[in-house]
Structures are given as structure tokens and as C-alpha cells.
Amino acid sequence: MRYLDDFEIGQRFDLGSFSLTAEDIIGFAKRYDPQAFHLTDDPDGPFGGLIASAWQTGSECQALLVKSFLNHAASLGSPGVERLRFLKPVRADTVYQASFLIMEVVPSQKRPDRGRILGRLELRDPDATLVYSLDGLMIFARR
């Protein structure tokens, strides 16, 4: 179990990877984001084919963050997101790699049993190009 006191600025955690099938993308889109470029593989469309909803990308990243990081830490939730960027489309049958970078570690002045970190969740394609980035605040218990 990791606590606030165990984190240092600059630490990076590998969260694992994911890949979506065309069926995954279309199924999510039908339910949550039914825009044409999430529903059909149209080479003449604005993205040159089928792409995942940015919200599906975020959901996949969140799942990796929870399974590989938050479930092994004294997480007390999140007060919010500072910055969110959808930089490149996520496509079917491509493996994407996620990581989490610690950017700030701040013990609470008012509640000494906890503190916050600012972390960056990143998703990269097979060429290591950044496709998704989220800077979020998280609260962690202290030892």
C-alpha cells in the first residue's frame, strides 16, 4: 500500500496497455457517443476511418489507473481535473500504453492525516506519440 509520503515528484508508474476492437468502439458509441465517426469505418470521414470516443479512451485509461495504481494506494478520491487533452484519435486493433507521472506532492495544512498529489495520466501509441493526457488532483492518506 502506498501513502502520500511514499510519492516523489518525477516518479512514473507503468499502468499497462489496452487495445479496442471495432466492436468495442461501436458498442460504446451506440450507448454514449453516437457520432458517425465512432459508428462507421468511413475512409472519407473526418478522421479517415473509425475512431474511439474520447470518453471511451478516458474510461479505458481510468480503468488502468485504478487497477494498476489506485487499488494499491491509500486513495481518498479526487477533487477534480486540472487539464484534459485528447491529442490524437484512438483506433481499433492498436495497442496503447498508459503511465502515471507524479508532478506535485502536497501535505494538507488543515488535515495532517492526508495530502494531495497532482498527477499526469498519459496514453501513448506504438510510436510513443502522446494521444491522451489528463492532469488530475488526488487525495491520499498519510502514514
Q: Predicted regions: what is each one?
A:
Residues M1-I9, F86, V90-V95, S99-R143:
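HotDog/MaoC-like acyl-thioester-processing domains
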Residues M1-G80:
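Hot-dog-fold acyl-thioester-processing enzymes
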